[in-house]
From Swiss-Prot:
NCBIfam families: recR (TIGR00615). Keywords: DNA damage, DNA recombination, DNA repair, Metal-binding, Zinc, Zinc-finger. This is Recombination protein RecR. A zinc finger (C4-type) spans 56-71. Residues 79-179 form the Toprim domain. May play a role in DNA repair. It seems to be involved in an RecBC-independent recombinational process of DNA repair. It may act with RecF and RecO. It comes from the Bacteria. InterPro entries: DNA_Rcmb_RecR, Hlx-hairpin-Hlx_DNA-bd_motif, Rcmb_RecR, Rcmb_RecR_Znf, TOPRIM_dom, TOPRIM_RecR.
Length: 203
C-alpha cells in the first residue's frame, strides 16, 4: 500500500474494467513519470468527456450532440435498425462496411445476478421508436446483434417475443459464425460482416 494521492490514484484506476491492481499501479507510476503538460492534456480530455458527451436521443449511442452522427446522416437507411448491447458494438459493426442502416443501443443485456432485466434496458425506447416513425420512415427490419453468449441470447429471445407481432416488421438475428461466449466488439471484420449478410429471420 502506498500513501495519500498515489494510493488514491491506484484505487481509482483499479475501478476501470479490465484493470487489476498490478495494472493500476503500473499506469499510476507511468502517469507520475510523464511531463505536466501531458497530464494537463489528459485531464482536459476527461473534462470534455464528462461535460460534453451524452447519449443520442434517438439510438443511445455516445454523441456530443442531441443526435449522433449516424442518426443525423440522411444517407443512412432508417428502415433498418441494428440492435446492439453497447455503443462500442456499433464501432464493431461499422468496421465491416457491410451495414448502412441505423442502430439502437440497449445499454447492456439480461443479467439476473446483477439485477438487469427488461426494465433496465432500452427496450421500451425501441418499441416507441418503431411506433413513432422517426423522421417519417417506417422501420421494416430489426436486426438483433446482441453478443453470442448466454446473456445476449436470452436478450435476443426476449426481443423476438416482443417484436414478432408488430405488423410489417421483419426480425432477424445475425448468423452463426461468431464464437459462442464472445463479445461482438472483438469479432474480426470479415466474420462479423458475414454474420450480418447471412442474418436469419426469427419470425
Amino acid at each position: 500500500m502506498f500513501e495519500g494521492p498515489v494510493q488514491d490514484l491506484i484505487d481509482e484506476l483499479g475501478k476501470l474494467p479490465g484493470i487489476g491492481p498490478k495494472s493500476a499501479q503500473r499506469i499510476a507510476f507511468h502517469l507520475l513519470s510523464v511531463e505536466p503538460p501531458d497530464i494537463d492534456r489528459l485531464t482536459a480530455v476527461l473534462a470534455k468527456v464528462r461535460d460534453g458527451v451524452r447519449f443520442c436521443a434517438v439510438c443511445g449511442n455516445v454523441s456530443d450532440d442531441e443526435r449522433c452522427r449516424i442518426c443525423a446522416d440522411p444517407r443512412r437507411d432508417g428502415a433498418l435498425v441494428c440492435v446492439v448491447e453497447e455503443p462500442k458494438d456499433i464501432q464493431a459493426v461499422e468496421r465491416t462496411r457491410e451495414y448502412r442502416g441505423r442502430y439502437h443501443v440497449l445499454g447492456g443485456a439480461f443479467d439476473p445476478l446483477s439485477g438487469i432485466g427488461p426494465e433496465q434496458l432500452r427496450i421500451r425506447e425501441l418499441l416507441t421508436r418503431i411506433g413513432d416513425r422517426v423522421d417519417g420512415v417506417d422501420i421494416t427490419e430489426v436486426i438483433i446483434a446482441t453478443d453470442p453468449n448466454t446473456e445476449g441470447e436470452a436478450t435476443a429471445t426476449y426481443l423476438v417475443r416482443m417484436l414478432r407481432d408488430i405488423p410489417g416488421l421483419t426480425v432477424t438475428r445475425i448468423a452463426s459464425g461468431l464464437p459462442m461466449g464472445g463479445d461482438l466488439e472483438f469479432a474480426d471484420e470479415l466474420t462479423l460482416g458475414r454474420a450480418l449478410t447471412g442474418r436469419r429471420a426469427m419470425v
